[in-house]
Amino acid sequence: MAVMEFANVSFRYPTSKEQVLKEVSFQVQKGEFIVLCGASGSGKTTLLKHMIKSQIPIGIGSGSMYFAGADIETMDDRVAASQIAYVGQDPEHNMVTDYVWQELAFGLESLGMSVPQMRRRTAEMAEYFGLESLFRKRTAALSGGQKQLVQLAAAMVVQPKLLVLDEPTSQLDPMEAGRFLDTLAKLHEEFGVTIFLSEQRLDGVLPIADRVFVMEDGTVTDTTPRRVGHLLKERHDPVYAALPIAAKTALCCGESGDLPLTVREGKVWLRDYLKAHSEVSLETIVERITKMAPEISVSEYFGNADIEKPDIQR
């Protein structure tokens, strides 16, 4: 049985004639890591809100959403809150208490958990997320990255079956975003929680994702991390710019198969490509990349990949 299922879901807001979701259907299996991407205004946030009973927007809709076979709209509120956790874009807006320990305990208290159980759960989560030193600090004194980490810990403390995240790194700097995504990958690996993540920093999540859902004009296309680059390129989707450098390099060179996602994989791919295409020089590839994907820092990429011209062009 699927953890999450959408069956022909369509939706529009009361003040609009345009459908935000158009006959959306998909299934998410237990333990999967799903990445949702798409241009601004494609319907991502509205889609995610339909997964959270308390956040389903008011409007005109059709179709059904199911969690573990149960209709989300008619689920018991307590069950929905304990089984499906949500982390939003703005940690400032999502904070509901003054202190970190209160933030961690808030969801458990809402579910009626006993004080001893709450203490044990919050202590375990604080230790797991490395929040011991922040445990009694005011939430207002935390950095953006720390606040978002607290939000993630608060979501996980109820031990949900599904974790839904709406662009959680959008307000974080690159280093904080990297640490957050690393923590998310660790959670998925160690807890086996099903993750549905809307994210634009694709370079940090494609290597750990099982599938990628691409939204465009209210529709969803299901693809894989190693094939999504082809789809984005074909559609001239602005999200193409967020692909890992290794994937864009391969696309610029005409790769039609699975794409490399990490610098290490990119190094291997480029070495093999140059061996198979002796007529192509590294300078030609650099020129091609610069023309087709000017956002790539070519010198930084090849430096990180530790590729030296004499070695790969022999």
For the regions a language model picked out, list residue spans one by one.
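Conserved ABC transporter NBD signature motif
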Residues: 60-71, 313
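ABC ATPase C-loop
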Residues: 155-156
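Conserved ABC ATPase "signature" region
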Residues: 116-134, 296, 300
